């Protein structure tokens, strides 16, 4: 089996059409002009499935592609259009039988993620499966080569406005946002 990449969304940070926009693209009936925010899911040839970014559209992206299980999540950067679907990981955590779903991000994003979602990361009570929060475990990404869950990556930084974001190469595929 080869790797399989599913594009869950290829739109801008607002998605397409944009609310209140009356341009030709946003008014178009062409299904190619109806795009959710950017994310992919990769099913590797060694039977691992990983998600790149959790957009605010994540629930519909997963449902419309019949995705019920992932092994880990990669975050490319800390913008809202790449993070704010994080709560929709809850049902995917159920298959981990009380264990935390690993998510990977650059070390400089760890505090930002934890501060943006304190209800997930600042739990003081015992973790309860299905207790209203996703059970997630932060794992650092190291630039260069790294093996995650038997999946080999080469991670690198890219310019994205005034910040740097994470890109990666896996097998014969590269992901550049």
Give the role of each language-model region.
Residues 1-176:
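Binuclear metal-dependent hydrolase catalytic cores
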């Amino acid at each position: 089996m080869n790797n399989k990449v599913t594009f869950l969304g290829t739109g801008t940070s607002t998605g397409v059409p944009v609310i209140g926009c009356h341009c030709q693209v946003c008014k178009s009936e062409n299904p190619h002009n109806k795009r959710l925010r950017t994310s992919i899911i990769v099913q590797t040839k060694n039977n691992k499935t990983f998600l790149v970014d959790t957009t605010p559209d994540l629930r519909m992206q997963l449902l419309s592609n019949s995705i019920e299980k992932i092994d880990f999540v990669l975050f490319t950067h800390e913008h809202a259009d790449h993070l704010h679907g994080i709560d929709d990981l809850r049902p995917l955590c159920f298959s981990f039988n009380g264990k935390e779903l690993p998510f990977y991000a650059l070390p400089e994003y760890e505090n930002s993620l934890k501060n943006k979602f304190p209800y997930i990361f600042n739990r003081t009570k015992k973790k309860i499966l299905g207790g209203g929060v996703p059970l997630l475990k932060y794992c650092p990404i190291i630039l260069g080569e790294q093996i995650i869950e038997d999946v080999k990556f080469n991670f690198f930084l890219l310019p994205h406005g005034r910040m740097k974001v994470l890109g990666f190469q896996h097998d014969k595929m590269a992901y550049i946002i």
